Regions:
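Mobile, glycine-rich extracellular loop/lid and propeptide segments
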Residues: 77-80, 99-107, 135-150, 155, ...
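Extended ligand-binding clefts on enzyme/binding-domain cores
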Residues: 25-47, 51, 76-80, 115-120, ...
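Internal amphipathic alpha-helical repeat/solenoid segments
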Residues: 42-85, 90-112, 117-133
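Short glycine/serine- and small hydrophobic-enriched flexible loop segments
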Residues: 87-94, 143-154, 214-221, 286-293, ...
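Hydrophobic, glycine-enriched assembly/anchoring segments
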Residues: 379-410
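Bacterial N-terminal signal peptides that target proteins for export
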Residues: 1-8
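C-terminal motif of bacterial Sec signal peptides marking the signal peptidase cleavage site
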Residues: 17-19
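Inward-facing hydrophobic residues that define packing positions of alpha-helical scaffold repeats
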Residues: 90, 103, 148, 164, ...
C-alpha cells in the first residue's frame, strides 16, 4: 500500500509538471449533448468546409504553388475579412498549408510595402491582387494577429513562416502609427478600444462586431511584446463597451457606433441614415459566445444578453426571423442590400450566430435554435441569392463552436 501511495504521488507530481498543468481548456460539444453522434457532427463540419473551400461554388481559390485567396463571390472581390476568416478556419481545422497559402497571398498583394500605410493591408482587392481601396479595415488586422498567434501555438515557428515574428511585426506596425499622414493604429488610444479603420477620420467610431475581448487576451498571453497589460485593459474595456452597444431589452446592436455604443449616422452619397442591425452585426452573438467560451470573464452579463437576443429572434418564429432590425427589434428603417439583392431573408449566417449563443443560455428556444441550424443547408435561396462566403464562413464558425472545435489551444 505504501509503495502504491508513493507511485500515486509521483504520478500526480508528474501530471502537474506535464499534461495536467498544460492549462488546456475543455470545450463543450453542444451538438453531442443534443444527441447527435460524433460521426454525424464530423460529417456536418466536413460538408460545410467542402462547400466553402472545395466545391465548384467554393470561395477558396489556390494560386500557383504557395498562395490562395478567399473570394467574396457575390461581390467578386477579396477582402482582409475573408482572408483572416479563412486563416482562422485553417488553424482551427489543422490545415497548415491552407493557412500559409492565404497568408502568403495576403502579404504579397494586400500589404502596403511603402508610404504612410506601410505594414497595414489594403482591405479590398480584385482577384488578381490589385487594390480597389487602399485603406485598411481594423477587423482584418485584428484577426490576422490572432490567427498568427494561434498558428504559433498550434504549429510552432520553425516552418517556412515564423508566425510569432509576423504577429509581432504587425503589432509593432499598429502601435507605431500616431496619426501622422492621416494613419493611426487600430486601437483608439483615448478609449482603449478598437476603431472602425486605422485613419484619423474612422478612428472616431467603432463597429461592435469588431469587439472580441478574448482575442486581446490571446495577444496578452502569446505576443511577447511587452504590451500584455494594455491588451488586458482593452479586453476589459471591450466587454464594457458591448454592455452599452447592445440594447438592454432586445440585445440588438447597430452596425457602427460611437465608443459609448450609440448608433452613428451613415452616409452614402446623397443618402444618410442611422446605423442599424445589418450584416456586420450578425457576428456579435457569436463573438460574445467566443469570449464566453474562451475567457469566461463576463458570463453573467453574456448569459443575460444571449437570452434577450434569442428571445428577440424567436419572437418572429425560430424558422422565420429576418436578418436586419432596428434596435428595438422592429423592422429596419433601411434595408441593406447584398450581391445585387435588397430584401430581408431568413439567413443561415444569422441563424448560425444566433444558435451559437445557445452555449451561453438555456431558455426554451436555445436547443430548438441549434436543431434548426442543424436542419439547414448552405445552398442558394429560392430567389437565386447565394453567399458561400459570408453565410458560409459564419456557418462553419458556428459549427466549430457548437461541436467544441473552435479553440485557443490544442
Amino acid at each position: 500500500m505504501k509503495s502504491f501511495k508513493v507511485l500515486a504521488l509521483c504520478a500526480a507530481v508528474l501530471c502537474s509538471l506535464v499534461s495536467c498543468s498544460s492549462g488546456k481548456k475543455e470545450y463543450r460539444n453542444y451538438f453531442k449533448e443534443l444527441g447527435y453522434s460524433q460521426e454525424e457532427i464530423d460529417a456536418k463540419i466536413q460538408a460545410a468546409v467542402h462547400e466553402v473551400f472545395e466545391s465548384e461554388r467554393r470561395a477558396y481559390h489556390e494560386v500557383g504553388d504557395d498562395m490562395a485567396y478567399v473570394a467574396d463571390v457575390k461581390n467578386r472581390d477579396v477582402r482582409t475579412e475573408g482572408q483572416s476568416y479563412g486563416m482562422m478556419v485553417a488553424v482551427q481545422m489543422d490545415k497548415q498549408d491552407m493557412f500559409d497559402r492565404i497568408w502568403t497571398w495576403t502579404k504579397t498583394y494586400m500589404e502596403h510595402k511603402e508610404g504612410p500605410m506601410k505594414g497595414f493591408f489594403a482591405w479590398h482587392c480584385r482577384y488578381d491582387g490589385t487594390h480597389i481601396d487602399e485603406g485598411s479595415a481594423s477587423d482584418g488586422e485584428f484577426y490576422f494577429v490572432t490567427d498568427l498567434l494561434l498558428a504559433s501555438r498550434r504549429w510552432g515557428n520553425d516552418g517556412k513562416i515564423n508566425y510569432l515574428a509576423d504577429a509581432q511585426s504587425l503589432l509593432n506596425t499598429m502601435f507605431s502609427k500616431d496619426g501622422s499622414d492621416g494613419v493611426t493604429g487600430i486601437i483608439n488610444m483615448d478609449y482603449k478600444l478598437i476603431n472602425f479603420c486605422p485613419d484619423t477620420v474612422s478612428n472616431r467610431w467603432t463597429d461592435p462586431s469588431y469587439h472580441i475581448p478574448a482575442f486581446f487576451e490571446v495577444w496578452a498571453e502569446s505576443a511577447q511584446d511587452g504590451r500584455a497589460d494594455l491588451y488586458r485593459e482593452i479586453a476589459a474595456n471591450s466587454r464594457q463597451f458591448l454592455h452599452k452597444a447592445c440594447n438592454e431589452k432586445t440585445g440588438i446592436n447597430a452596425d457602427q457606433t460611437t465608443f459609448d455604443g450609440k448608433p452613428i449616422t451613415r452616409s452614402f452619397g446623397q443618402y444618410s441614415f442611422v446605423s442599424q442591425f445589418w450584416y456586420d452585426s450578425w457576428r456579435v452573438p457569436m463573438n460574445i459566445t467566443l469570449d464566453y467560451n474562451w475567457s469566461g470573464a463576463d458570463k453573467e452579463w453574456q448569459s443575460e444578453y444571449a437570452d434577450k437576443f434569442q428571445r428577440t429572434m424567436a419572437s418572429y418564429g425560430i424558422e422565420k426571423f429576418p436578418d436586419q432590425f432596428n434596435l428595438d427589434g422592429g423592422a429596419p428603417r433601411t434595408i441593406m442590400g447584398a450581391g445585387g439583392y435588397r430584401t430581408l431573408r431568413h439567413s443561415i449566417g444569422l441563424v448560425a450566430t444566433t444558435a451559437a449563443a445557445s452555449m451561453m443560455t438555456d431558455n426554451e428556444y436555445s436547443k430548438d435554435l441549434v436543431r434548426h441550424l442543424w436542419s439547414m443547408k448552405l445552398e442558394p435561396y429560392e430567389d437565386g441569392y447565394y453567399d458561400v462566403y459570408y453565410d458560409g464562413l459564419l456557418y462553419i464558425f458556428s459549427l466549430l463552436h457548437l461541436s467544441g472545435n473552435y479553440r485557443m489551444d490544442w
